Amino acid sequence: MIYPQGDQYMLTRRQTLLAATATAVIGIAGVDPAHAADKVVKIGVDLSLTGADSQGAVSVKNALVMAFDAANEGHAIPGYKFELLVTDDGTATAGQYDPAQAATNARKMVADKDVVASIGPQMSGAGKAMTPILSQGGLATITPSSTNPDITNPKFAEQYRPAGKPIYFRTVTTDAFQGPNMANFFAEKLKVKSVYVLDDSGAFGVGVADSFQKQAEAKGIKVLGRDRLDPKAADYTAILTKIKSLNPDALYYGGVTQAGVKLAKQAYDIIPNVIKGGPDGMTSSDLLSGA
């Protein structure tokens, strides 16, 4: 688990109250919590269930449902029943996560006093929108996939944790590691000498492409250009034709599947012999079926 840099985890007000209440209930002499009325404890969940990233979102949701069902059936905390408050930050208009919807979801969680913690969001752009709200509400969250390093960087604490305490945690590493490691792989293993860099305009895509590009240049790889894609566009022929004319050894794309699948399909037609690479945001069966 990766914790915010330079910070020590501190329990939020709600978590402290939950821990104290659970201890008191379990410790009351003569009371069998298994036979007492269960107190409902809610865990907020924010995922991109609508749009291009829905496949991963559904997988996470299903895993959470299984885990919390097992916890309830096994009386993980006697006297308490867990409920998931599942929210969707994806919209049909955006075709993927929508930061405005993510912010609305965060406000909903903070307003519900039964919500003691949160899981998510799935996407870094949603995380940037939610984190200040969760911080002000004293609600901690842990994300299974958001990797933008700025959110947990003390340098941006005023922006992303205005209340002071760190509330954003991860089960994954950040783009500060992922992007540079791909650049190292390009340089050391694939012997790439030149590369063109693209991103999908999202917080994750821009961040991971930035970190890749910085390390690629440090490793002596010549960056021939950098462009930002519109993830809603259907055709990337123009930019790929431009890249073809520059004859790079490799193409690096920072982003997720909404633009990535279309880009990969067209790239294999237009620049078939160019090495192609990208981040974990492209890990989806959609890439195999669509490209």
Describe each model-derived feature in a short phrase:
Residues 9-21:
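N-terminal secretory signal peptides and thylakoid transit peptides that target proteins
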Residues 115-225, 275-291:
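Extracytoplasmic ligand/sensor domains, especially the bilobed periplasmic-binding protein
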